[in-house]
Amino acid sequence: MATTVHLSSSSLFSQSRGRRDNSISSVKSLRKRTVLSLSSALTSQDAGHMIQPEGKSNDNNSAFDFKLYMIRKAESVNAALDVSVPLLKPLTIQEAVRYSLLAGGKRVRPLLCIAACELVGGDEATAMSAACAVEMIHTSSLIHDDLPCMDNADLRRGKPTNHKVYGEDMAVLAGDALLALAFEHMTVVSSGLVAPEKMIRAVVELARAIGTTGLVAGQMIDLASERLNPDKVGLEHLEFIHLHKTAALLEAAAVLGVIMGGGTEQEIEKLRKYARCIGLLFQVVDDILDVTKSTEELGKTAGKDVMAGKLTYPRLIGLEGSREVAEKLRREAEEQLLGFDPSKAAPLVALASYIACRHN
């Protein structure tokens, strides 16, 4: 039998006002954390800060300030994410979702989505729902990836992992909820902004990127590859893992941005190749950092891939070989941006350099 709950108009107003006040406070707090964390991360890097677009004079006014661009986009994304998950009942699952979704991070995937949309003539508002959807799915994958049955990680973004705070059962549900919310958010928020045929294509692209031919496939092969003898496994095997586990979602982020921005098929394919390169680049650098940085520097447990016996680039080709591969991938990514307006391509050129030179 259904239970009827009667609320007075004043009670409803009070609850609504409380949620609004909490949301405003949360956005302000999140904005402050974003500026501090991104400023720290970007200031410590040797490259990717000030990028000189092709054909521009070498002065401070024409140089592209990637640090400022990244902070501003992250602030916009964080504000949109905060609004997307209000504190409604049941509170526990909403809190678990918000704990990981609003934990900070570099927001590389939504930034890529927005920058790709802007590259082909779109704007931030048009891309934002897709950018948030990609970040929701990324966060979902991190929550599940950290579980004891997967990577069994204790730290993520400098904080205890979701299951350490809310328990394994709630972490599984939080990840599931984010996966569903991603598609709901993208389709509902974009209604009226994006043509239905474009939205259908975007949904298919995103679903394909995370299913059994995408992220899930990469995670499965990654788990199955633990303790394999690196002498008997080639780079092709490792590339398969990371093209699916890491690059697939980055690829989807870029392609969704171009779709939302009304790009051509040729532009979609160029950005797909660009994202594939930076996806592999991201993982090569991640493998390097895992064996060269401390837990404090990374914000997650250092050396856990080595301890788990996982296949990594340094394990297969050494640190120097891994660095050479990273530089090759960075150059190949930049080559895909030739022919675009240099000023609009500047954020993506800078993003490739940022990923190559990051320290955490």
From Swiss-Prot:
GO CC annotation: chloroplast; plastoglobule
Cofactor binding remark: Binds 2 Mg(2+) ions per subunit.
Organelle targeting sequence: 1-39
Pfam families: polyprenyl_synt
Residues that coordinate or bind Mg(2+) 2: 145, 151
Binding-site list for isopentenyl diphosphate: 106, 109, 138, 157
InterPro entries per the UniProt record, alphabetical: Isoprenoid_synthase_dom_sf, Polyprenyl_synt, Polyprenyl_synt_CS, Prenyl_diphosphate_synthase
Catalytic reaction(s) noted: isopentenyl diphosphate + dimethylallyl diphosphate = (2E)-geranyl diphosphate + diphosphate; isopentenyl diphosphate + (2E)-geranyl diphosphate = (2E,6E)-farnesyl diphosphate + diphosphate; isopentenyl diphosphate + (2E,6E)-farnesyl diphosphate = (2E,6E,10E)-geranylgeranyl diphosphate + diphosphate
Pathway annotation from the record: Isoprenoid biosynthesis; farnesyl diphosphate biosynthesis; farnesyl diphosphate from geranyl diphosphate and isopentenyl diphosphate: step 1/1; Isoprenoid biosynthesis; geranyl diphosphate biosynthesis; geranyl diphosphate from dimethylallyl diphosphate and isopentenyl diphosphate: step 1/1; Isoprenoid biosynthesis; geranylgeranyl diphosphate biosynthesis; geranylgeranyl diphosphate from farnesyl diphosphate and isopentenyl diphosphate: step 1/1
UniProt main location, coarse: plastid
Top EC class, one word: transferase
Residue stretches in coiled coil: none
GO biological process: carotenoid biosynthetic process; farnesyl diphosphate biosynthetic process; geranyl diphosphate biosynthetic process; geranylgeranyl diphosphate biosynthetic process
Source domain of life: Eukaryota
Binding, Mg(2+) 1: 145, 151
Localization per record: Plastid, Chloroplast
Keyword Zinc tagged: no
Family matches, as PROSITE patterns: POLYPRENYL_SYNTHASE_1, POLYPRENYL_SYNTHASE_2
Residue sites binding dimethylallyl diphosphate per the record: 156, 245-246, 283, 300, 310
EC number(s) on file: 2.5.1.-, 2.5.1.1, 2.5.1.29, 2.5.1.10
GO MF: (2E,6E)-farnesyl diphosphate synthase activity; dimethylallyltranstransferase activity; geranylfarnesyl diphosphate synthase activity; geranylgeranyl diphosphate synthase activity; metal ion binding
Functional description taken from the UniProt entry: Catalyzes the trans-addition of the three molecules of IPP onto DMAPP to form geranylgeranyl pyrophosphate.
Record NCBIfam families: FPPsyn (NF045485)
Quaternary structure (record): Monomer. No interactions with GGR.
Family, as annotated: Belongs to the FPP/GGPP synthase family.
Protein name: Geranylgeranyl pyrophosphate synthase 9, chloroplastic
